[in-house]
Design a protein with these regions (language model features):
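Helix-turn-helix
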Residues: 17-20, 24-62, 66
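Amphipathic alpha-helical segments used for helix-helix packing
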Residues: 99-129
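N-terminal intrinsically disordered/low-complexity leader segments
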Residues: 1-16, 193
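Short alpha-helical scaffolding segments that buttress acidic/His motifs in well-ordered protein cores
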Residues: 94, 108-112, 155, 159-162
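Hydrophobic/aromatic residues within well-ordered alpha-helical segments
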Residues: 17, 60, 67, 71, ...
């Protein structure tokens, strides 16, 4: 069916629409912050009509929450969290969050900061952090670290800070050096073999 006047022709394959819209939200926010997030901007990025975006999500907040939930999967995947190996391999792929999924990383930090001002986003941010902490606990254990929830939270906070700094300063060598030091700390504390 041809697009009518005022409508964009969809470049999104059937069954991939929701994910394409969520990825478009991530891209729009990563590029211009939440202030740039509109139905029209998401529609233009995804190659669909803005009515379709509104139909799928209903409100701007629902769009942000859904994209925040979506963003956890790619963020965990790119960093290799949960892949078993030796402590020497642990967190080796974390710097990829700054290259392969930079938009996801930037999007998440934008939403996290916005949740300070907008309590309606806090639950989504809380769920995001809970997902990261759960993945970190499993990842530490898969690498032979005797970890509990508190240690997973501490280690995740350190990595999260490194990623935030890396996003702002683009100094991957600093991130890698700090991760090596964190491995040494885990080993010297007797928490890993």
């Amino acid at each position: 069916m041809a697009a009518t006047r005022g409508e964009a022709k969809s470049d999104v394959a059937y069954g991939e629409g929701r994910e394409a819209l969520l990825r478009a939200v991530v891209t729009v926010v990563a590029r211009g912050g939440l202030r740039e997030l509109t139905y029209r901007a998401v529609a233009a990025e995804a190659g669909v009509t803005h009515g379709l975006v509104r139909h799928h999500f209903g409100s701007r907040d629902a769009l942000i929450v859904a994209a925040t939930e979506y963003s956890l999967g790619p963020a965990i995947s790119v960093t290799g969290l949960g892949e078993a190996g030796s402590l020497d391999d642990w967190a080796r792929d974390v710097p990829k969050a700054l290259t392969d999924e930079e938009e996801i990383t930037a999007f998440q930090f934008e939403v996290i900061l916005e949740s300070r001002r907008r309590p309606e986003l806090r639950e989504a941010v809380s769920d995001l952090y809970a997902g990261f902490r759960k993945a970190m606990l499993a990842d530490l254990r898969a690498h032979g670290v005797q970890a509990d929830k508190a240690l997973a939270t501490l280690v995740f906070a350190a990595l999260d800070g490194l990623i935030f700094e890396g996003l702002a300063l683009n100094e991957p060598q600093t991130t890698r050096a700090a991760i090596r030091k964190l491995r040494e700390l885990l080993r010297s504390a007797g928490l890993a073999g």
